Swiss-Prot record:
It comes from Macaca fascicularis. InterPro entries: Dynein_IC, WD40/YVTN_repeat-like_dom_sf, WD40_repeat_dom_sf, WD40_rpt. This is Dynein axonemal intermediate chain 3. PROSITE patterns: WD_REPEATS_1 (PS00678). GO terms for biological process: cilium movement involved in cell motility; inner dynein arm assembly; negative regulation of Arp2/3 complex-mediated actin nucleation; negative regulation of cell migration; positive regulation of osteoblast differentiation. One of its GO terms (cellular component) is inner dynein arm. Residues 1-27 are annotated as: Disordered. The gene is DNAI3. The keyword Endoplasmic reticulum does not apply. PANTHER family: DYNEIN AXONEMAL INTERMEDIATE CHAIN 3, DYNEIN INTERMEDIATE CHAIN.
Amino acid sequence: MAPKQKKKSSRRKKSPKPILAASEDMEPVNMESMGHPEIYPLVLTTKTQEIFNCRIDEDITDEQPYKLINKEDIFEDLRNRAAVSDFHPVKKIVQEYPGNELLLVYDKDFKYGLNFYLIGTEEGEENYLNPPEVSEEQEEYKEYIPEDVYIYKPPVSKPWVSLGSEKEIEEESVTESTKQITYMISRKRSEFGAPIKFSDQNASSVKDAYIECTAYPDKNFTLKQLEKDVGMQVIPQIKDISTQTKWTYPKNATTQYYPREFSEEEKETLKQSKPLVDFLNNASISVEIALQQNEITNTFIDDWKHLAEEEGTFGDKTDTHLKEYQSFTDLHSPTEKMITCVSWHPTIYGLIAVSVAVRLSFEDRVHFSGKLLLQPSLILFWSFSDPIHPQLMLESPDDIFCFKFCPSDPNIIAGGCINGQIVMWDITAHADRIENIKGGGSRSKKATLKPMFLLEPESNKEAMYIRHCAVSSIENGHKRVITDIHWLSDTFEINRMGSVFENRSGICCQLVTCSADCTICFWDIRPQKPLTPQTTEKKKEESIEIPFDVPSTFLHLDLSWKPLTKLKLSKGETSLDHCPTKISLNEDHLLCKTQDKMLAQSKTAKAEEMNPYHNLESGVANLLKPIDDFCTKFFVGTEEGEVIYTDWKMERDPETGRFMPKKPVNLHTIHDGIVHTIQRSPFYDDIILTVGGWNVAIWKESVMTGPLLQSCCAPKRYTSGHWSLTRPGVFYIGREDGYIDIWDLLEKTHEPAQSQNICITMITCIKPWIFSPKQQFIAIADYYGTLHILEIPWTLSHPSANEMASINHYFEREVKHLEYVEQRKKIREQEKKEMEQEMAKKKVKIYQKSKEQMEAELKMDYESYLELEKTVLINLGLIKVTEKGSYLDVM
């Protein structure tokens, strides 16, 4: 820095420039055309803002957008920097200004074209600091003055409002009043498919070969006058009539009233009267209560106004659609790829990571496996400042289908491959590089993002490839694609039996993954204690040279990493297992709220220059304190659309003595397809959203009779979903046709509040992100590899005054409804049992007869049998009836 100061001083000696001689300078540009000749726009660079202590959002804010600058400081800056000074265009105005301080104003909305403007007159400065009061007559007169300056506002789509014009158009439109006759002519079914031969034939040679349509006069069109449009209106005659009573005899008269007062004697007697004393004693308590209420609460407040929401908010309430802010596409990839997972960087605002995979089926992957080995599988880091070039590229042995940033250290990333391996990256060496990206700085420096035309992408930028630190063992890990991965919280850790212990290290050291091979695995990134000690010679033989660009953070895990414990969800009596696709732990809602905590931890880690992951101790110790009241149950979504609530703790099998996974606590088959999303609400610990197949469901952890909400079948299959981060009753659902359904439970609970088209193909992932209290974004990835960044409107990002209480009341009401349905089901089953018992009793009563009745019935049956036998024998001629007696003679 010292040589630069010498150069500046040498310049000052060689070419001194008098400041007061400003006749040769060009005239400064003012805003006389806009009616403000005292205003001179300026462009102040960051260096000039630091010199004059007028930095945006630090020295100059929205509450105080101006600063008084000493005239001598401007002259000093002109002497030091000459024509390079930002005040050089207004040098003449500064010289002619009579006062000692000039008013510099920050033009946030670029009303006058630049980011600052200078007020060149004392009168203008006084009018800005102390604006004159405008009378009501002048304000009414201003409404009729046409404005010469028009600010262009882009058109915004608004919902159509009916004003009745469509009814007039329908009345004037011509519609057919008569019903049309339709003829359908077809061949016989026996002649279908018969060969057809066409030939020439004379129409006159065959009888009835043709039908002649001769012309004849139509009587329907012989009317001379058809119709006439005639309009008539009856209007009564109007007369103006007025009456006025005349004041014939005017007189001036005045009237005055005065109150009747007690005399002194009456006052004394009234004070001593018992009724007055009793009244004062009884009324004094009520008066004291009323006075206390007046002191405690404001009795003049208007409760009706407080029912509505505040109007002085950011954004347009009528705008309910997502607006596309930016999009990212990997233009340098030679193959067609899709985005499988999206994650915003927890601490660096404006940085987002996506994993991409080749769009091939299983058979095509096997066929083109040789070519796919030559192409790297990547996780791309995109920044808002450069939509073309990725900031970082994380390499992996195969395509990544899910990944997560470590909650304790955002520079540690874990991902799951399609081949069943877990990959670990450490980007600590590149943290400073991605933190200093243009447009992606910390949240404290800026409150809003810059538009794209103000950002300058870096030219001739080379892609930064980062190799992985460690890969899990192929033999001991998953056998198929890893569909979901989660970090366990830094407050606990588990052992091989699933028991929960206190985590004394204070960092996240364990992972949980689920795969399509019907297993759920828990992993520990710390080095495990070897069963047998190894000699130093053997260690030297097994040592492998590490490339210089690969950190040694997780070198102890590379190709030898095994799961701590493995779970299989059996289907009960059968030998088959459930195939998990997504899981949701009880601690997931806590990890969603740790962005500020991670930011503070990253700052302290920088100050200490010590990464705790570089000195990891061995696995779970024996002296850790167990946590007894910890909930070890979690939700699992399967490939068949089942939602399972199970426990990761092991139990000992009484027959074999081995530790086996527990049976699922509950199982519901709600979805008719693969479960793509299981996510806990960021506002309620026990509310879970599941998305799969053609419908959506919302569950409560303590209610296992069924879902609180189950949507009907959608027009297209659902592929992803996510809760809103700021509104408890809003969640976003992606479909396979490129539409996104936005559900608002305050508005509708049976269907989406609105649907919006985002792309032309399937939506694969949805991730919202809070940039500032006034601005939110949502990242939507599609099947063609494009990442869409959309801005969330005000109505979908800002909750109402009582939204959380209303949604909580809705969930409680649905819980009561499920309990009522369950009670009615039990009552109905009991009623059915009672009805069956009554029917059985009636049947028993019918068949239980007395002995006399049974003998009488048997006697009647026997007599009927004898009669039948007699008739049969008579008909056969075997017997004859004599006239003398009633006996029978056998022939």
